[in-house]
Amino acid sequence: MSGYKPVAIPTYPKLGEKITQDTLYWKRYKTPVQIKEFGAVTKIHFSPVQPCTYAVTSSTRIHLYGQYSQEPIKTFSRFKDTAYCGTFRGDGKLLAAGCEDSVVQLFDISGKAALRQFSGHSKAVHFVDFTADKYRIVSGSDDYTSRLWDIPNGVEITSYNEHTDYIRCGCTSALNNDLFATGSYDHTIKIFDGRTDKSVMSMDHGQPVESVLLFPSGGLLVSAGGRYVKVWDILKGGQLLVSLRNHHKTVTSLCLSSSGQRLLSASLDRHVKVYSTMNYKVVHSFDYAASILSLALAPDDQMIVVGMTNGVLNIKHRKPEERKQLQSTTKRHPRYRVFVRGKDYMPKQDDIFISKPVIAHLKKYDKLLKGFHMTEALDTVLQPQIRNQRPEVTVAVMNELKRRGTLKNALAGRNEKQLSDLLIFLLKHLVNPQFVPILLNVAEHIIDIYSPVVGQSSVIYKQFIRLQEVLEKEINYQEELLKMLGMMDTLFATMTTKKESPWEEPKPILPLSSQ
């Protein structure tokens, strides 16, 4: 028994992960810093100017954080009820926020008391933003209205009452001082011009709208609601360009990278998706521990901040670029004494040669095979940890049992659970070209052994039906491939021109018949 050879596990080439420039770029973020807030984080907004300060709206407070601070550098708590949508002005000096008590408040970053309070809404205000000229504020409320406010005079300029449900999001144009968009739970996105008394454009998202975003150029608008992210062409009258469905739950927040070439979306499914704005394909994805309500990307893309339903603020900082040290490409050649070392050594007759014994560490299935416990060896490699993560080990043991002529005996005598596990493995890997030769033999033995009693268990019966479907599908697939191969051979044969072989004998020239 000392000459037992362990089962040889074949190795197969694996397809490596496709590494793209986006993968390398978005993976260059450090381990996240997590901060616990007082409630669910409903809004995160970065100051457009340096230093990189961002406002976090949670419960009845708005906290201001520095780029690397883990404690708030300032807190605005002058709210009677839940605060919403803390948003910086373009110069970073003022902050506006809505509240559950229907009041819009305006704060100076250097102070704590409100500079202005705009009253006019009758229900909670969930959306607040500054216009591009910095002198007006746009707000949207649960009273179905959106309003335009004058900051210097503290009065309402105009009011729009076109939505038929809660207004929960909106945005202003970075180029046009009068243009802004609102998204509502009535499934519509409406674009307003502050110089007119009604909307200039309307789009139907098809789901309650949770977030809207205007591109810096002003030509495209992105809306998020339900599981969909939709891109609209404003210059073509609100034409739908693309509808993205890459999330499994409601999409709650949107943001753009500093260059505008990447679009980020956050969802209740705990994922952040990164899209290319060239083809709107997902180029990267982040996973988080809880459902996401808010998302923001720093103006220089150095930070990603995510707010979750459990009140946790997740902050990722980008790693600094590593300086590549120039190394000499010239290898140092070994010295002369390296080559002449030991050339004069002569072994002696009384030298003792000791060889270190090699201890063979056998796997559990090898020990069972060594002891001729065939059924137990097969049961070992059918455990979920082995059959799911290393199916080649399971197939190698089956191949060894076939070589010994004991495969059929090892497959016999199984209960419902053991047979079900074996059929699950077959259904998963039977059409794998690497495993087909041995698994077809295993399938034949199982059909021969258990076909008389297959009707006694509904689970086994369904798996046998599924096995039949898999085999029929694979046979049809092979037949189609053979037909295609025949057509290709015919095409190649017709395209090939016959060339005269130099070894062929020339045809004899027959004499002309005499007149």
From Swiss-Prot:
One of its GO terms (biological process) is ribosomal small subunit biogenesis. Pfam families: UTP15_C, WD40. GO terms for cellular component: nucleolus; small-subunit processome. Gene3D superfamilies: YVTN repeat-like/Quinoprotein amine dehydrogenase. It is found in: Nucleus, Nucleolus. Its main location: nucleus. SUPFAM superfamilies: WD40 repeat-like. Part of the small subunit (SSU) processome, composed of more than 70 proteins and the RNA chaperone small nucleolar RNA (snoRNA) U3. May be a component of the proposed t-UTP subcomplex of the ribosomal small subunit (SSU) processome. This is U3 small nucleolar RNA-associated protein 15 homolog. It comes from Xenopus tropicalis (Western clawed frog). The lineage of its organism: Eukaryota, Metazoa, Chordata, Craniata, Vertebrata. The gene is utp15.
